[in-house]
Structures are given as structure tokens and as C-alpha cells.
Amino acid sequence: MKKILLIDDSDTYTWCLQKYLQHRGYPVKTASTLKEARAAIQEEMPLVVCCDLDLPDGSGMDFLDEVRAADKELPFILASCHDRDDYEQEAKRRGATLCMDKMKELLLQDKLVEYAYRQLSGEKAPTFHKLLFCPCRRYQRRSAAGGYAAKGL
């Protein structure tokens, strides 16, 4: 069965995401370097890729280019502690599905589950979208991460 591929050099961070996703019934493959990630993709194309922007042996942005050369539709989430404004436009241009702040782990977990479910059910996801935040409390709901998100997202 295809897996969610998590690529991050933080073992603790990867372990937490992996346990959450496995508990939800999704198989997970982890890699701490781009070399390991390339080997995992050679073995089997994943359901979803979630890749850190900065890895010991290269950039998640460059790995995005490699993945897009092989598969234009595969959901690819770039996750980083950096300010998204610094890399989001470039990631969008290169074909990233979503850019996420690693510190919003609960939201990232939910997005990974959403994209994995869409892949398994054959639903098409938008090629790129931003998470929208609504200033009017009338259209908001409290998120598990402590912020507000627009209803219906």
C-alpha cells in the first residue's frame, strides 16, 4: 500500500507525525535526508510527500523539482520553521501543493490526512491553495491549534 512520505532531519518531529498518522490508519515512510527520500520514491511513489525546506544534504525546494519531473500531480507539502513569505511564491511556482509552518503541527497533521484521503479516494485537490484566516468572528471556528480558521475549510 502506498505511504505518506515524511522527510525531516528532526527525529522527534518525524516520530510525532508518524505516530499520529499511523494511529489514523495511514502507512508512513520516513526519511531524514534527501538521499533516503530518493530511495523511498524509487521503491514506491508515495500518497503524499511532506518535506522540510532545509535538510542536511540539500533543499526541499530542489527535491520538489525532482518529484515534479517524475509526477506533476503528487501532493507535495513543504514544511518549515521559516517565514512562509520567504519561500512560498517560489514553492508555488515550482509546483508545491501547500506550504505549512512546522510549528502548527496539528494543522499539518490534518492536512496530511486530508491529502492522503483524497489520493486514496481519487479526489482531485487544488494545485495550490493558501489557508485563509477570517477576521470576522461570525465566520470563524476555534481550531485545535488555538487559532481561528474560516468555517467550511
Regions found by a protein language model. Give the residues of each.
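Conserved acidic carboxylate
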Residues: 8
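Active-site beta3 strand of CheY-like receiver
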Residues: 44-50, 55
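CheY-like receiver
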Residues: 111, 120-153
